[in-house]
Every structure is written in structure tokens, then in C-alpha cells.
């Protein structure tokens, strides 16, 4: 069970600097809300219609913080009906599991437009991969902090095994148990308090890369 692969920071992180919408504290984005997202979509390879996800074996090798296998895993987490395209319904379903605050139609539109290169109203694997490749590596430390805050549900500066399990359950990983989460914490828990602080969380993410 690879934590970094299961929850890629740049796919599910909330965007605090989105200029268009920022109402919901649980509004998650696939990446930064740059107005140049259309340029990021060049050569994305989306076919604009129905069909299956492009096999990872034929996707090009490009510099990216994540492998295409990791991107595919993230894509499958969102594409709940497994039809090869992330629809508005898929996105709304994910966000409803990640937080209690309902998103407005405008917020959903912004999140789709950030990644939907061909404008067909859905997100395909190639479009998501193109978005990830274009992200700025300098944002990594900020996004790591935001990822920590997402796990830390009670905002006490520590992540418990229960909080870790909540995230796995939310995104649909039925295999992860509380004991699994306790073992993951024990691997980086330097002070032995049974919790993970931000420094220890950083080590946890490094170990999962």
C-alpha cells in the first residue's frame, strides 16, 4: 500500500489560491488554478468522445513528479463508473466524500475547466497527465503542508491512525485497516506518541515515493 501513490498531493489538494472561487474549504483541485491551463493541454491526446483509458504502455515518457502508473491510479479513484472519463457527476461524488460543504455549479465548472482540454465536459487520462506534467515543482512544499492539513481532520497538528484510516475509507480503499494505519505511523513516529506531526508526515511521504 503506497500512500503517495494512493493520494497524489497534486491531484486532490485543495487550492487556496484559486482566483475564481475560494468559498469552500474542501474544494479540491487537480492542480493550481493558473489561467494558462489551456496551454498545459497541448498534445494531450484526448479523443473528445467515449472510450477506454489510454494504456499506460503507450503513453510518452515525460518529466513529472509522478509516474503514469500513479496518475492512472489517481484517475481511477475519480472515475468511479470506470468509463474512461471523469464526468461532472464523478467529480461531485468525490468532493461530497471529501467534505461536508456542497460546491456550487461555478466551482465545479472551474475545476473541470482547469483540466478539460478539449472542452467536452469530461476529463480523460491524457488530460490529467498533461496537467500533472505542467505543474510547478516549487509548489511541492506548500502542497505537502496542505495535504497534511487534509489528513489532520481535527486540526490539532497531529495525524492519528483513525484520521489516516478515514482518508483511505473516503477514497474507497476497503483493504486498508486500522492496524495498517498504525504500522504506517509507527514507521515514522520518532517520539513514539502514536501520532504523526508534520515533520514525521514529510518523512512518511518521502518513504512512499
Curated annotation (Swiss-Prot):
Q: Where does Ca(2+) 1 bind?
A: 79, 81, 83, 90
Pfam families the record matches: EF-hand_7
**An individual GO BP term:** defense response to fungus
Q: Which domain of life is it from?
A: Eukaryota
Instruction: Kindly give the InterPro entries that the UniProt entry links to this protein.
Output: EF-hand-dom_pair (IPR011992), EF_Hand_1_Ca_BS (IPR018247), EF_hand_dom (IPR002048), EF_hand_pair_protein_CML-like (IPR039647)
Q: Which residues participate in Ca(2+) 2 binding?
A: 152, 154, 156, 163
Q: Which UniProt keywords apply?
A: Calcium, Metal-binding, Repeat
Q: Where is this region: Disordered?
A: 22-59
Q: Where is the composition biased (Low complexity)?
A: 27-38
Gene3D superfamilies according to UniProt: EF-hand (1.10.238.10)
User: Where on this chain does Ca(2+) 3 bind?
Assistant: 189, 191, 193, 200
Stretches assigned to the EF-hand domain: 66-101, 103-138, 139-174, 176-209
Query: Molecular function (GO) terms listed?
Result: calcium ion binding
- Outline what the protein does: Potential calcium sensor.
Q: What name appears for this protein in its UniProt entry?
A: Probable calcium-binding protein CML36
Q: Which organism is it from?
A: Arabidopsis thaliana (Mouse-ear cress)
Organism phylogeny = Eukaryota, Viridiplantae, Streptophyta, Embryophyta, Tracheophyta
Amino acid at each position: 500500500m503506497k500512500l503517495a501513490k494512493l493520494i497524489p498531493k497534486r491531484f486532490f489538494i485543495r487550492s487556496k489560491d484559486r482566483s475564481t472561487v475560494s468559498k469552500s474549504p474542501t474544494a479540491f483541485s487537480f492542480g493550481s488554478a493558473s489561467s494558462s491551463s489551456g496551454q498545459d493541454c497541448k498534445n494531450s491526446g484526448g479523443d473528445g468522445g467515449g472510450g477506454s483509458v489510454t494504456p499506460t504502455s503507450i503513453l510518452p515518457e515525460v518529466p513529472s513528479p509522478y509516474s503514469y502508473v500513479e496518475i492512472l491510479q489517481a484517475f481511477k479513484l475519480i472515475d468511479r463508473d470506470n468509463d474512461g472519463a471523469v464526468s461532472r457527476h464523478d467529480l461531485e461524488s468525490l468532493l461530497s466524500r471529501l467534505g461536508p460543504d456542497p460546491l456550487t455549479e461555478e466551482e465545479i465548472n472551474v475545476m473541470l475547466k482547469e483540466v478539460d482540454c478539449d472542452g467536452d465536459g469530461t476529463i480523460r487520462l491524457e488530460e490529467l497527465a498533461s496537467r500533472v506534467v505542467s505543474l510547478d515543482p516549487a509548489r511541492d512544499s506548500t502542497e505537502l503542508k496542505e495535504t497534511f492539513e487534509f489528513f489532520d481532520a481535527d486540526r490539532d497538528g497531529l495525524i492519528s491512525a483513525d484520521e489516516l484510516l478515514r482518508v483511505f475509507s473516503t477514497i474507497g480503499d476497503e483493504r486498508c485497516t486500522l492496524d495498517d494505519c498504525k504500522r504506517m505511523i509507527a514507521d515514522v513516529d520518532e517520539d513514539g506518541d502514536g501520532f504523526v506531526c508534520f515533520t514525521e508526515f514529510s518523512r512518511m511521504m518521502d518513504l512512499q515515493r
